[in-house]
Amino acid sequence: TNNKLKISTFNKFLITFIGILFLYLFYLLIPLLYDKSWVKNSIQSKLKSEFKINLDNSSDITYRILPSPHFFIKDSKILSNDSKKKVEVADIKYLRIFLSQKNFFNKEKMSLKRLSVNNANFYLFKEDLKKLNDKSSKRFSNKKIRINKSNIFFKDSLNEIIAIVKIDNATLFFDDKKLLNLFNLKGNIFKIPFTYKLKNTPNIIKKKKFSFEAKSLNLSIENESEI
């Protein structure tokens, strides 16, 4: 009788567990029911407002639940925010936009959690460096952007490539606890491995600190300044 009771209790637990698992999987699949054009427009709008990323709306978007719920975009392009002339500033082979799981029942409350960029090419001109420097003094999104296995192409005024930075991995976000913009990059230039770290406080008193280290050259540079 005790054995039957144990088996019965186990069966109830197993059935309950499987039932909850199926309900959870069904919940995770709800974004598949969202209208595709709505998803595309919503993603584009949220990327622009939260990350200042102007994504080309011709990109095709699919939804996946593994490793966690996200929209997957293959072969996308990022355009400049210049209203007069849209210039391609990056092409991304694989872009993953991870979602918060708080409320999939109400699509209007869809919230982005973080971004993952893989196999991307970024194109920068001399004037872009000043723009990036100005933007780095403003508050980043507190949602992380991770970049892996990508390249930065520096170009001159004739559109010729003068240098290539290969990115192994990089992260960019605003740390809510430390109240700091953080940007960390590990990569190489001219086949020389290096790490670059940037911290700044986008508050009333704006301070910026960066460090550059290339161990193979026995080179380490640090600088701190008020903006």
Predicted regions and their residues:
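Contiguous, well-ordered beta-strand patches that form the walls/edges
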Residues: 180-183, 188-212
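Short, intrinsically disordered, charge-balanced linker/junction segments flanking boundaries
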Residues: 211-212, 220-227
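A short, amphipathic edge element
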Residues: 52-59
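A short, sequence-level motif marking secondary-structure junctions
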Residues: 62, 97, 198-204, 226-227
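N-terminal type II signal-anchor transmembrane helix
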Residues: 1-52
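Flexible beta-edge/linker motif
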Residues: 11, 32-39, 61-188, 215
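A structural signal for short, hydrophobic beta-strand segments that form beta-sheets
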Residues: 57, 169-171, 200
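Short acidic/polar mixed-charge low-complexity motifs
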Residues: 53, 86, 190-194, 219-221
